[in-house]
Amino acid sequence: MRLLKSHPLLKLVNSYLIDASQPSNISYLWNFGSLLACCLIIQIVTGVTLAMHYSPNVLEAFNSIEHIMRDVNNGWLVRYLHSNTASAFFFLVYLHIGRGMYYGSYRAPRTLVWAIGTVILILMMATAFLGYQHSPKWFDISNKGSISNKGNITNSLPPLLQRWGGRINKRLFNKNLVKRGYCTSSSLNSPEMSERLQTIINELGINPVYVYEDLNQPSSWKQILHDTRDLSGVYMIINKTTKDYYIGSASNNRFYTRFCNHVIHFTGSKIVKLAIKKYELKNFAFVILDLYPNVVTKENNKELLDLEDKYLKLLVPNYNILTEAGSSFGYKHTEIDRQKMKDLYSDARREKIGSLNRGKKFSPETIEKIREKALTRPPMSEETKIKCIANTRPVVLYNLNRTIYGKYSTILEAANAINCNEKTIRRALQTEKKLVKRQWIVEDFSDK
C-alpha cells in the first residue's frame, strides 16, 4: 500500500480507483462504465489481431476466415471473443442507459453529460449497423437474378437489378453505386447458365460481375458492347470443354475491343485463336471478373495492371503465355518516329513491295525441280536424331493423387501419351502448379 501512495503514477491510479471518495449509497450498478471500457479494449485488441490475418477480398475472404479458425494460434478464440464482446458491449450500453434513467441522471446538473452520451449512442448505432449496408447478409439473390435488401436498414441504397436478354446470362449491377456485388447465395445457380460453366466457376471459386455464353450469336456481341460501355477491369475467356481459360485486362470502353480481338477477328492471343478453331466458338464463355472503379489514365494504369496480375497469380491461366500483366497504355510515337516510318514506307515503296510477285507464276520446269528436290531429300540421320534428343529433357507425369502415371525420356513422348501438344507440357513446366489438362502434374525428371 505504501508504494501505491508514494509512486507518482500509481498514486494517481490509486486516487481514482481505490481511495476515491464515493457516495455511501453507491452500488454495483455503477460498474457499467468500467465494463464498457474493458469491452472497448478487448474489441480493439482482437480487431487489430483479426485484421492482420483477414483478407478483404471476395476471392479470399472465406479462405482467410478458415485460416484464422484453423491455422492461427487461438484464432478461434480471438474471433469468437471479438464477435461476442460486440454484443456484450451494446448489452451493457443499454443497461447503462437504463440505470441512468432510473436514477434520473438526465436531470440538471448532468443534462449536458446525458446529451453527449445520447450523441455517442447514435454514432455507435450508425457505425455498427449502417456498416452492414454492403454486407452479404443483407442481400438475397434469387434464382431469377433479382437482388433484394433483406435488412431494409436504409433507403439510400438503390435497388440492384439484373437484366436478361435472350439466352445471354449475365449479372448487372448499378454501375453508378457499386462496381461489384457479392453474396453468399450467388445467382450463378440460375437455370440460364449452363451447368458446365457453373461447375467451372464454382471450382475456380470466383464471383464474376458479368457472364456471357453463346458467343457464336451476334446478339451476344451486341449485349457485351452495350453492357461494358465505359467500363474497365479484368476479363476471362473460358473454354467450357477443357476448362482452360485466358485472363486479360481492358481500360475504359475496351472490353468489347478485347473480345473482338480474341474471339472474332483472331488478332489477340494465338493460343485462344487455335483453341476456338479446334473446339468451336459456341463452347466458350466471356466473363468479366472484376471492374476497376476509376477512369483509367496513364497515372493510375499501374493499379489496373496490379488487379490483373493478382488474378494471373491466383488462377494461373493455361492460355496466357506471360505470367505477369503488361500494357502499352499511353504510349505514343514521337513526331520524329512517325516521320521516319512514313519516309521508310512511302506509297511508292508499298506499291513496289506489293507488286514483287503479283501476277507471277512458276514455270512448269521450276515446279518440277521443286517437287523433285522435296521428294529426294534424305531423311534425318541417326546422329542428328540423337543430337535433337540430347537437347530435350526427361519428364515424369503424376496423377492428381501424386501416383506416377508414367516416365518419359522426352517431352514429345509424354505429349503423345496424353494426347496433347508438346508446348502444353513446356508451358506447364514453367508454372508453379505444373498442371497439364487439369488431370496430370508434370515434373522435370532431369533435376532429380
From Swiss-Prot:
Primary location recorded for the protein, binned into one broad class: mitochondrion
Residue numbers spanned by region cob intron 1 encoded: 133-448
Region (cob exon 1 encoded): 1-132
Transmembrane segments: 32-52, 86-106, 112-132
UniProt keywords, alphabetically: Endonuclease, Hydrolase, Intron homing, Membrane, Mitochondrion, Mitochondrion inner membrane, Nuclease, Transmembrane, Transmembrane helix
A GO molecular-function annotation: DNA binding
One GO process term, biological-process aspect: mitochondrial electron transport, ubiquinol to cytochrome c
Keyword Mitochondrion among record annotations: yes
Residues annotated as domain GIY-YIG: 230-321
EC number in record: 3.1.-.-
Keyword Nuclease recorded: yes
Pfam families: Cytochrome_B, GIY-YIG, NUMOD1
Membrane topology: Multi-pass membrane protein
GO cellular component, as recorded: membrane; mitochondrion; respiratory chain complex III
Effect of W221R: In strain: FGSC 430
Location relative to the cell: Mitochondrion inner membrane
Role: Mitochondrial DNA endonuclease involved in intron homing.
UniProt protein name: Probable intron-encoded endonuclease bI1
Naturally occurring in which organism (per UniProt): Neurospora crassa (strain ATCC 24698 / 74-OR23-1A / CBS 708.71 / DSM 1257 / FGSC 987)
